[in-house]
Structures are given as C-alpha cells and as structure tokens.
Regions:
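Conserved beta-strand signature within the Rossmann-like core of class I S-adenosyl-L-methionine
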Residues: 156-164
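Class I SAM-dependent methyltransferase "Motif I" SAM/SAH-binding loop
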Residues: 70-72
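Conserved class I S-adenosyl-L-methionine
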Residues: 2-59
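Short, glycine-/aromatic-enriched active-site segment of Class I SAM-dependent methyltransferases
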Residues: 164-184
C-alpha cells in the first residue's frame, strides 16, 4: 500500500464503508434507512448519471479493454463485462475489490477480468487501455495534474472523468462527513482547476 498517509486514510475509510457504499447502487444487497433513501434520491443521482453516461460512451466496438480506477463495488465493471469488454478493476480498498470479485463470479461470464489492489498514482501497467473510467475518483486526489498526465500515458483512446464540484449542499455535507471520518476529500471549482499548469 502507499507510503502516502492520505492515500492510506482513504483506503481505510473505503474498506470499512464498502458494503454501505455498494448499497447506494443496489439496495437489495443491504437495505437502506429511510434517511439514506431520501439522501440518495435528492443528492446522489449523479452516481447513476455517471454510470449511464460512461456506459453509453464505452459501448463502441473500438473499445475492447477498459481500466476502471477506483472501481468501488464493481457496478460499472459488471456492466462492462456484460458488453464483453476486457476489464481491469483497480481500487485501494480490499473490501471493494472483494465485493467486485463476488459480483463478477456470480455472473458466470466468460470474460477477461482482473483486479488490482493499488494506488493508481503508484501503479505501473504493462499495457495501455482503450478506455479508462475515472468516476468518483478525483474526490480523493490531492494532485490532479500528475494523475491526469498518468491517465494520458495509460490510455490509448479515451478517458472518461468526473470531477467533483465544490459548491452546494452536497459538497458542504460531504466535507463535514468525510472530515469526521478522517477521510481526505478534494473538491474542485472550474477556477481552482484552471490554476494548474497543464
């Protein structure tokens, strides 16, 4: 695991949060409280939107190999495997990868799939990927420029990125909630991203 304390803290947080996080996508895996159901409906629609948008782009026949960085509990991974893509799922939380592996195993698909337990910024690949999905990942990236440069090196065709905004109620409550749980969180505005030299 990473020598970076922030990365270790993020991995620890998501390792403990894996089952609950997975239930945001699929409630039948773990029932959600009424409060969480309301929060999901009001403030977490972007999770589903990102998933659908990413899939719509990656359906192309030209996209054969996909790296899902910060794969979480594997919801995008499963959808990509259903599209017969070769998928590499990378995460820093072992429990997230375990949930992903169990979900993939239950599908009984003949596909090329593997998991990698690593900090993306420190992991070197032997191959380039046709597409890289980076959804819900930059929330935990302190240095976005170095990650963006690495993405450009690791992708041969396309990169799908979502970058969290720093405004509104959802951003505010996430800042409070994650600080209480000792999980570093990085939110960005257009202006803050423009300050980085590309």
């Amino acid at each position: 695991m990473s020598d970076n304390k922030n990365i270790r803290d993020i991995g620890t947080f998501f390792n403990g949060y894996a089952a609950e996080f997975s239930s945001i996508y699929l409630e039948d895996e773990r029932p959600r409280s009424l409060f969480n159901k309301v929060m999901d409906r009001l403030f977490r629609k972007d999770i589903e939107t990102r998933l659908v948008d990413s899939l719509n782009h990656m359906r192309k026949d030209s996209i054969k190999t996909v790296l899902d960085i910060g794969c979480g509990p594997g919801h995008l991974v499963v959808k990509l495997l259903e599209l017969n893509k070769d998928v590499t799922a990378l995460d820093i939380a072992p429990n997230m990868l375990e949930i992903t592996q169990m979900r993939v195993d239950s599908m009984k698909l003949e596909s090329n799939f593997k998991t990698i337990l690593a900090d993306y910024s420190e992991h070197e690949f032997d191959e380039k990927f046709d597409a890289i999905s980076v959804m819900g990942f930059f929330d935990y990236v302190e240095d976005p420029v170095s990650v963006l440069k690495k993405l450009l090196n690791d992708a041969s065709k396309e990169i799908y990125i979502s970058i969290p905004g720093d405004k509104g109620f959802l951003a505010w409550q996430r800042k409070v909630r994650y600080k209480r749980r000792n999980c570093p969180l990085y939110l960005y505005s257009k202006e803050s991203l423009e300050q980085y030299p590309y």
